[in-house]
Regions:
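Membrane-interface helix-loop junctions in multi-pass transporters/channels
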Residues: 1-123
Length: 123
């Protein structure tokens, strides 16, 4: 149990650090209305989970490290929800709906692409 917990913690720490770095890099180059950093990390996280589902499905310790840990730390549903709420509170209803629906649909597509690619890489 301790080994599994350490794998999740290590992956989560790395994923959280990567999310933070991604947000910093994107903030330097983007100042638009859509919270791009959250959208990017969530879509990339969905893609990675899709890819890793196929590549790590039979290996419990890799699933814990990469899917539960890294992707769990890298993606952020709570920030997505808070940003959506802020848009709604500010009256930006169209932007909020676009962000919410777009995030979910693009995330599902990214996950599907990841699963598809995993089947090509490791049939």
């Amino acid at each position: 149990m301790l080994r599994q917990l350490l794998l999740v913690a290590l992956g989560g720490a790395l994923g959280s650090a990567m999310r933070y770095l991604t947000a910093i890099l994107l903030a330097r180059h983007y100042t638009g209305s859509i919270p791009l950093a959250t959208l990017v990390v969530n879509v990339l996280g969905c893609f990675l989970i899709g890819l890793l589902i196929g590549l790590c499905n039979d290996t419990a310790h890799l699933r814990l490290l990469f899917i539960t840990g890294f992707c769990g730390g890298f993606t952020t549903f709570s920030t997505f929800t808070a940003e959506s709420y802020a848009m709604l509170r500010e009256g930006a209803y169209g932007l909020a709906i676009l962000y919410i629906v777009g995030s979910v649909l693009i995330g599902l597509l990214a996950l599907w692409v990841g699963v598809y690619l995993s089947r090509i890489i490791a049939p």
